Amino acid sequence: MQQHIYYTKYALQFADMQIPELVTVFNHQVGNTGWTGMRAYHDQALIDEFLRRGIDVSDIYNGKAISFAHPVRYDITYNRLATIG
């Protein structure tokens, strides 16, 4: 199946970012309750970029749903995103 053009746009944007920048992008979504198709592409591309880099996202992603309930930090020792709070 072909990726949607907006997913591809976000995926390319995130591929050029450093991990701290990706964490900042994630944390800007915390508490945002608005939902649109565009946000779905954005959020999935963001999670996919963390996964592409081999980062453990199990605190925020169960393979189906992404939780933006808490901000995260990057734990370099364990190569994972850890929730704060």
Model-assigned labels for residue ranges:
Residues M1-G85:
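Extended, charge-rich alpha-helical interface modules
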